[in-house]
């Protein structure tokens, strides 16, 4: 059967891209379709098709392109006679429709579009163009969500959002995490081979709290710095993004050392996780792949009381839920997490293995 995998856009890194990677691995004969593809070498074994937006100045300008996305998804041209579509959606990709053809579609929902349904969780929802069209697009989005044969959500948290926004039920299929690879390596320090990264590794504090994400305001890495300061522990922040200068200014005023690691390799990133006393994750996330990775290398997690990331660990076993994301409450949770006994990383992360996802997603589209 000829299948088509669809995602809003394809970037060089990101949680949705990891899901799409595993979908492509699970369905090796499927084509891929996106609005634009900014990682052209990512799927060498697949035909990857872009929309007309990829050939315009709107390419990559997500907020500005938003008003044109619904009509773009409704006027697709089929490259083959597809038997099904599996759509990795977090904006409007689930609106996808081929002119003159009715292809059965299955939706894997990372979230109903935060831009229009939860702008308080995504600063891009404050863009003037987005605010202007949000009410209209909510009505349109709810109507289009009636079309799929079935919807899967990446967490119970998102399933509840799907019910509220789209008035549809969804089955929960957790995203795939490279748990087996993380467990197999053992000591990740030995995998760091770059000279500069070895110097970073060797200069790490003996005990520290870690924050990892893209540097954007809604990821709340500022709270990681403030919580580490309250707990009296050095802080390591890893990632990259537009909020770097603000975070560095905050770090300069902190009374504990704050180390920034920009664009770490996988080996260095997992070394940072493995050596950390606690991984702190204060953002409200739809799921949270990185907390699972931290647990897979044996590091406990601290998070706030709201979000899909609460489904990634067992409180009191491999992590602690802070009573709020106030820095003082996060600091108390850090202290409690450090005191936890060692946990079984394999057992804790088993439900998130790539093989589990592949089995469930095949069954979801009826190709088990």
What is each of the regions a protein language model found here?
Residues 29-95:
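Active-site donor-binding segments of glycosyltransferases and PAPS-dependent sulfotransferases
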Residues 127-151, 158-160:
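Membrane-proximal helix-turn-helix segments that form the acceptor-binding/catalytic region
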């Amino acid at each position: 059967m000829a299948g088509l995998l669809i995602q809003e856009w394809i970037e060089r890194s990101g949680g949705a891209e990891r899901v799409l990677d595993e979908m492509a691995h699970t369905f090796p004969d499927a084509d891929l379709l996106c609005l634009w593809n900014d990682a052209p070498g990512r799927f060498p074994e697949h035909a990857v098709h872009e929309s007309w937006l990829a050939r315009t100045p709107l390419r990559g300008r997500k907020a500005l392109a938003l008003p044109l996305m619904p009509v773009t998804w409704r006027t697709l041209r089929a490259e083959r006679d597809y038997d099904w579509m599996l759509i990795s959606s977090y904006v409007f990709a689930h609106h996808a429709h081929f002119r003159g053809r009715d292809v059965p579609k299955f939706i894997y929902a990372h979230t109903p579009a935060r831009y229009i349904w939860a702008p308080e969780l995504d600063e891009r929802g404050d863009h003037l163009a987005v605010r202007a069209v949000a009410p209209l697009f909510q009505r349109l989005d709810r109507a289009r969500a009636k079309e799929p044969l079935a919807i899967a959500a990446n967490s119970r948290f998102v399933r509840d959002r799907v019910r509220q926004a789209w008035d549809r039920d969804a089955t929960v299929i957790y995203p795939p995490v490279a748990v087996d690879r993380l467990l197999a390596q053992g000591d990740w320090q030995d995998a760091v081979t770059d000279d500069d990264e070895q110097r970073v590794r060797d200069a790490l504090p003996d005990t520290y709290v870690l924050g990892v994400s893209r540097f954007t305001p809604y990821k709340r890495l500022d709270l990681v710095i403030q919580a580490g300061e309250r707990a009296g522990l050095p802080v390591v922040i890893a990632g990259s993004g537009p909020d770097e200068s603000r975070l560095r200014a905050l770090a300069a005023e902190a009374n504990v050392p704050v180390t920034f690691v920009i664009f770490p390799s996988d080996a260095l990133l997992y070394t940072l996780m493995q050596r950390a006393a606690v991984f702190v994750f204060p953002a409200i996330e739809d799921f949270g792949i990185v907390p699972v990775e931290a647990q897979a290398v044996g590091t406990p997690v601290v998070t706030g009381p709201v979000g899909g990331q609460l489904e990634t660990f067992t409180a009191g076993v491999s992590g602690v839920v802070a009573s709020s994301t106030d820095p003082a409450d996060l600091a108390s949770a850090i202290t409690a997490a450090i005191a936890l006994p060692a946990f079984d990383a394999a057992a804790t992360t088993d439900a998130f293995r790539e093989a589990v996802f592949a089995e469930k997603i095949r069954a979801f589209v009826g190709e088990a």
